[in-house]
């Protein structure tokens, strides 16, 4: 049975592009939907090398070419993801409008291709921490893209948790072992928010992260 919120519909010659970080959620969506385009964006995040290593492994496993783009946004971020813990901003992860920027980059990258939708790896609960994890954000960005004739924005797993998404997709644990969620560098630190979430999910699935 398909879980609510996990879209599988596609028709005709339409193509889908997934913003792909090599993390658990985007990996599970990639494994399930096999979108035609997997877009990895190095926007200056300090974990880009680790994310890219994971993304390449997973793209190869599902027989998809990884499209790698670089856009320097580090000067606009602070906190662990930007490698700047000295900022006066007290939020550990502060990169204002980051997801809006990445979605816009995806729309720009594929403006000359018949891309029907851009997929993002938002899951249930993301909106409890960040406004860009809400259905309202997805709907608003979708309208904005549509104003310029762009593709639709979809969050196919926004109604399910990471664990529900994994169970429904039946992605192998071995593939999940390739995923990378650290915010602080090329190798998992084990203590940042990304690593803690990754480890919690893997432990619930019966395998240490």
PLM feature spans:
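Nucleotide-activated chemistry modules centered on ATP-dependent adenylation/adenylyltransferase
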Residues: 2-209
């Amino acid at each position: 049975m398909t879980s609510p919120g996990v879209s599988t519909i596609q028709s005709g010659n339409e193509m889908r592009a997934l913003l792909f970080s090599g993390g658990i959620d985007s990996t599970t969506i990639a494994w399930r939907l096999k979108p035609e385009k997997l877009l990895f964006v190095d926007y200056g995040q300090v974990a880009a090398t680790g994310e890219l290593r994971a993304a390449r492994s997973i793209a190869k496993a599902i027989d998809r070419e990884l499209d790698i783009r670089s856009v320097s946004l580090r000067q606009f971020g602070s906190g662990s993801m930007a490698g700047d813990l000295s900022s006066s901003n007290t939020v550990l992860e502060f990169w204002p409008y980051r997801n809006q920027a990445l979605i816009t980059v995806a729309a720009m990258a594929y403006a000359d291709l018949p891309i029907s939708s851009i997929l993002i790896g938002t899951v249930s609960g993301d909106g409890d921490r960040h406004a860009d994890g809400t259905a309202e954000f997805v709907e608003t960005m979708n309208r904005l893209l549509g104003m310029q004739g762009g593709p639709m924005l979809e969050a196919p797993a926004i109604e399910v948790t990471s664990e529900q998404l994994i169970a429904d997709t039946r992605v192998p644990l071995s593939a999940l072992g390739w995923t990378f969620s650290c915010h602080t560098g090329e190798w998992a630190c084990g203590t940042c928010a990304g690593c803690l979430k990754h480890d919690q999910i893997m432990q619930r699935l019966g395998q240490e992260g």
